[in-house]
């Protein structure tokens, strides 16, 4: 009744040492992120990009990755984010985009989300603002760069084509209707 990924006694870390010998680095994260795109603080937050395609920005307030809800895309992008900082950005119309992205399961995914948001905003784990500039200030990113990023992201939604990273049309969303939200990823 026990799973073992290696024969007993062979999990000694030799592969990690060999990787370091040829110049590899070791992540200084709280836990090995593997393929899961959430931080320790947001591991239970249902609006992480694992569940829905949202705008992802780095510490410069710029979009930096394909946000499709597929763990390897998100994890690779997040682990390579400048300054080890990234945010998932969305607006108050998230139920509409969730329904568009997941027509068969959106009701289940949205269950309890409003109450969860209230709790996480109160705890400081999720930021919210009625303005893009106010959200940028809370996130600590340059407001002008962030506003430009949001404007470009919204334009791609209107065009129905992601010309930057190729996110599928049905997975596109926009950041247009206040309040706006930022979740650390």
Locate predicted features.
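A short acidic, glycine-rich active-site loop
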Residues: 2-10
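Structural core of flavin- and non-heme-iron oxidoreductases
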Residues: 23-30, 178, 183
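Anion (oxyanion) recognition and catalysis
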Residues: 20
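An anion/pyrophosphate-binding glycine-rich loop and adjacent beta-alpha core
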Residues: 16, 25-139
């Amino acid at each position: 009744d026990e799973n073992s990924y290696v024969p007993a006694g062979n999990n000694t870390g030799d592969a990690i040492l060999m990787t370091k010998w040829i110049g590899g680095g070791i992540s200084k994260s709280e836990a090995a992120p593997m393929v899961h795109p959430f931080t320790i603080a947001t591991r239970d937050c249902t609006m992480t990009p694992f569940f829905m395609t949202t705008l992802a920005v780095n510490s410069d307030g710029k979009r930096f990755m394909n946000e499709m809800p597929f763990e390897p895309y998100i994890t690779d992008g997040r682990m390579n984010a400048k300054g080890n900082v990234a945010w998932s950005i969305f607006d108050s119309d998230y139920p509409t985009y969730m329904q568009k992205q997941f027509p068969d399961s959106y009701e289940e995914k949205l269950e309890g989300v409003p109450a969860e948001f209230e709790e996480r905003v109160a705890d400081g784990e999720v930021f919210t603002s009625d303005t893009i500039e106010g959200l940028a200030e809370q996130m600590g990113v340059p407001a002008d760069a962030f506003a430009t990023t949001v404007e470009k992201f919204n334009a791609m939604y209107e065009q129905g084509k992601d010309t930057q990273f190729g996110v599928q049309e049905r997975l596109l969303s926009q950041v247009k209707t206040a309040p706006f939200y930022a979740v650390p990823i």
